[in-house]
């Protein structure tokens, strides 16, 4: 939407450095991308403010903001100054809430690599979205500050965008999941890092519900070349399903290879543009395996598995399990964990079976009679029942 306010080539593949020289009433503070070069009060009760970002960025994340701001320096992270810009009446709550950005920024520097810009400003604004990841100058909605730090995950999402979406950008809009899916899962990773695996599972289960609900309304792949209204791509396929693809990829290649692959992908495309196949190649190199089948079924094919799990009463301490894929079309391929819980709830055991066909069966050792068999107890698979 940048072309609605700024004459520009409004496409993620056309990046530019920016200078914003703004003359505004002198009671306003002005913030924009990059580093402030000048702030001068003029004779007519106006003020000239000059901001410059020399690192080329997509025009969708170029921005200026002017308001009666309270401004706080929150600290340096790896030499990057972090500031908070909030309406003066929200000064106390806003400074407290936005100060979280310092620890969030440190997490992503450690996980992905060096921060691509020279400052990070977090700005209360009238954005139509919950947040907007403007390069080095993130905007959050007006009610994002209340003194409770309730928008920690939103801040993490927008900070993650500084690497994925702003610096390493999608080559075209069809591959926007490389921005939105990565930022969504980036927030998941941060929340897991800070609060533990249970918080990650809770977030992923909510995201899974959003994907399933969307797929019930619209059958479409993550990379959907039929779309002509680009705003229609801002949907759960790009955000939540994109995050789920990354989560399943993490299991497929392993923890260290996943992290290495993300870092290698970012290092290769920092400041540039990429397609899904570029990310696939980076993950194949890191994971030392062919992932063509994985990307075909999760990115280029619509839908997800719909599963039914059956089991027989154990005989001679052996339990027969049957997994059926009920969705239309061919089978998906995935590992599935199945957790049996005894009728009295005191015993449990988990097995992993490889599902490659519409029906998969396995016989396993089991010392008790299951009262239930729970599919995917540790939240690793995108599926519905």
Where are these regions (language model features)?
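Second-shell loop/turn segments in exported
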Residues: 7, 87-96, 172-173, 232-235, ...
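Amphipathic alpha-helical substructures
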Residues: 227, 235-321
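Active-site-adjacent bridging/hinge elements
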Residues: 78-81, 131-132, 157-162, 212-226
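Short acidic/polar inter-strand loop motif in beta-rich domains
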Residues: 377-385
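Hydrophobic helix-coil surface modules that form long, contiguous segments used
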Residues: 2, 7-156, 185-188
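Zinc-dependent metallopeptidase catalytic helix centered on the HExxH motif
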Residues: 98-99, 137-205, 262
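Acidic/His/Gly-enriched intrinsically disordered linker/tail segments
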Residues: 174, 180-248, 252-253, 269-270
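Beta-strand-rich binding/interaction modules
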Residues: 31, 291-292, 305-307, 311-376
């Amino acid at each position: 939407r940048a072309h609605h306010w700024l004459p520009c080539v409004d496409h993620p593949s056309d990046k530019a450095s920016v200078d914003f020289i703004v003359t505004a009433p002198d009671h306003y503070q002005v913030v924009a991308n990059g580093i402030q070069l000048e702030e001068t009060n003029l004779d007519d009760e106006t003020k000239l403010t000059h901001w410059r970002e020399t690192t080329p960025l997509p025009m969708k994340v170029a921005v200026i903001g002017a308001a009666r701001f309270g401004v706080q320096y929150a600290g340096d992270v790896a030499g990057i100054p972090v500031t908070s810009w909030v309406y003066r009446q929200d000064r106390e709550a806003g400074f407290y809430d936005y100060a979280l950005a310092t620890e969030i920024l440190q997490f992503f520097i450690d996980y992905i690599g060096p921060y691509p810009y020279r400052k990070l400003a977090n700005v209360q604004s009238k954005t139509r979205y919950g947040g907007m990841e403007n390069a080095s100058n993130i905007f959050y909605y007006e009610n994002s500050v209340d003194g409770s730090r309730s928008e920690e995950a939103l801040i993490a999402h927008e900070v993650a965008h500084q690497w994925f979406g702003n610096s390493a950008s999608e080559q075209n809009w069809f591959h926007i999941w490389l921005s939105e899916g990565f930022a969504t899962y980036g927030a998941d990773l941060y929340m897991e890092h800070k609060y533990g695996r249970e918080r990650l599972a809770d977030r992923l289960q909510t995201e899974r519900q959003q994907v399933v609900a969307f797929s019930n309304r619209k059958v479409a792949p993550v990379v959907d070349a039929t779309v002509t209204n680009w705003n229609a791509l801002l949907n759960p396929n790009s955000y939540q399903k994109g995050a789920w693809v990354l989560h399943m990829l993490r299991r497929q290649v392993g923890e260290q290879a996943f992290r290495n692959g993300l870092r290698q992908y970012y290092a290769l495309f920092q400041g540039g543009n990429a397609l899904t196949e570029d990310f696939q190649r980076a993950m194949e190199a890191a994971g030392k395996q062919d992932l063509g089948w994985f990307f075909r079924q999760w990115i280029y094919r619509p839908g997800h598995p719909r599963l039914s799990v059956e089991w027989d009463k154990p005989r001679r301490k052996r339990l027969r399990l049957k997994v059926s894929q009920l969705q239309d079309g061919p089978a998906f391929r995935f590992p599935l964990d199945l957790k049996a819980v005894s009728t009295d709830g005191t015993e449990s055991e988990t097995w992993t079976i490889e599902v490659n066909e519409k029906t998969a069966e396995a016989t396993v050792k089991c010392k008790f009679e299951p009262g239930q068999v729970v599919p995917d107890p540790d939240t690793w698979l995108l599926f519905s029942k």
